[in-house]
């Protein structure tokens, strides 16, 4: 797969040899919010680590992630839980994975730290989940309409990444969900099948 062929902006902005690419995701579908108490019990955290003002909610732009907000980055960084227990819980909700998110405004700019665990591992950059998070942030007023948010992921597994996300709100609908980031070419060649 050629990154440039699948993105809308690939080849445009370059920074230190890296090129920025952005992809558009499907319009989101929002599931029924989950109980703070149930989720806190399943992932083994104190319920007061979960903000009251934002729901824990399954969101899909193709693959369903349960967006689980955290009150602070330290609690998110310290997170350790049983993936098997969480997977059993998520199966009942229709979601595939949790996407743990801690959004914060810093100097007027919205940034977020995120984590995504799967099958015993941790993913350093989950674009499909980041699009769901962008949709969730716009839907619940965490992010402004079409505001670019930088999501840092992979810090705790020592593979830090940055994804730039945004989405628009048109009436009751969230649309134009975009996920982008910088990439560097590490290999070029031809594959003959």
How should these model regions be labeled?
Residues 1-193:
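Active-site proximal loop and beta-alpha junction motif in alpha/beta enzyme cores
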């Amino acid at each position: 797969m050629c990154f440039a062929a699948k993105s809308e902006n690939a080849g445009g902005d370059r920074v230190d040899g890296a090129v920025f690419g952005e992809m558009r995701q499907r319009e989101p579908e929002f599931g029924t919010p989950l109980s703070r108490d149930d989720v806190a019990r399943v992932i083994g955290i104190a319920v007061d680590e979960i903000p009251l003002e934002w729901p824990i909610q399954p969101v899909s732009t193709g693959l369903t992630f349960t967006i689980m907000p955290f009150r602070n980055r330290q609690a998110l960084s310290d997170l350790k839980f049983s993936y098997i227990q969480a997977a059993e819980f998520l199966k009942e909700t229709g979601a595939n994975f949790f996407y743990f998110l801690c959004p914060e405004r810093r100097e007027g700019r919205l940034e977020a730290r995120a984590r995504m665990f799967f099958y015993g591992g941790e993913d350093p950059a989950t674009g499909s989940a980041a699009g769901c998070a962008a949709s969730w942030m716009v839907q619940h007023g965490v992010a402004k309409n079409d505001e670019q948010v930088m999501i840092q992921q992979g810090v705790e597994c020592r593979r830090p990444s940055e994804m730039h996300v945004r989405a628009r709100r048109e009436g009751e609908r969230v649309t134009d969900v975009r996920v982008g980031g910088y990439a560097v070419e590490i290999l070029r060649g031809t594959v003959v099948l």
